């Protein structure tokens, strides 16, 4: 087994010419490069920067890099087209780059100029660069939260993460156990990365629970969006007068009745509920599969929901239908309609939203 010193000596022997050229360039220019979590970074902000960070859309992705290329060749090239706010070169343990980097400009115009000028630029013979718009990761998923956690309690627990948090949503966890998943949206990739680091270094405990903190994956985001909103994102929206009339007529009659009247006003027909109990979890939570068929809509609305049954002996399927109605009304509200029904099920029913 190699010792630590053996590994260091091996790394020093990898690409020594370019490493020496980089060190000479750093000494001559006085530029400061910082190694952080597998990447070497310049700026963020650069010397003399005043004001807020650049807006979203000001960063480009740089691919197809030869692995022995360093900042002394890349930063001057990308500074030709605009002022750099930050440059990040992804690094391996051996000191070679990982084949890609990110350049963030002071404005979107700089990023557009880099794409127009440097995409397919021949850094070396038969080695054209790939330069395209960077899609910044600004969203995290936090899975494993308690079923009864409220959004206000979650926001209170997230306060130490700083002012970069822009949006927090609580949704039913896609996992098999009762629980919730939080989707957190931040103002920038840096703010999201700092929050992720803080949560992970805190042994991934939040609200007293062991949670899984990850970058929000596109497939998970799509699955949760379909579960929450489903086909109603494409549904015609009722007029404001119809919504007001539904609210005035129903008062506190119940979420299912509200949904029924709303569908009538939208000329969609009466919703038909199908439910199936899939099992019972801890603390009396019941997991239901549901499907709601609305005659005037081509696609049914389906998903999973957890409910706790009331003590008045109501049938579990009826409780689940009420809870599903609340979810559908909230989905309609979030997709553009006014809120018809306050968040929560009928009196005495606990619902995992």
UniProtKB/Swiss-Prot annotation:
Provide one Gene Ontology biological process annotation.
spermatogenesis
Where is it mostly found?
nucleus
Indicate where this protein resides in the cell.
Nucleus; Cytoplasm
| Gene Ontology molecular function | mRNA 3'-UTR binding; mRNA binding
CC annotations in GO: cytoplasm; cytosol; focal adhesion; nucleoplasm; nucleus
> Per the record, a Pfam family?
RRM_1
Q: Which residues form the RRM domain?
A: 58-136, 140-213
On assembly, the entry states: Interacts with APOBEC3.
Described by its record, this protein's role is as follows:
RNA-binding factor that positively regulates gene expression by prohibiting miRNA-mediated gene suppression. Relieves miRNA repression in germline cells. Prohibits the function of several miRNAs by blocking the accessibility of target mRNAs. Sequence-specific RNA-binding factor that binds specifically to U-rich regions (URRs) in the 3' untranslated region (3'-UTR) of several mRNAs. Does not bind to miRNAs. May play a role during primordial germ cell (PGC) survival. However, does not seem to be essential for PGC migration.
Q: What is this protein called?
A: Dead end protein homolog 1
Origin organism lineage: Eukaryota, Metazoa, Chordata, Craniata, Vertebrata
This protein's gene is called: DND1
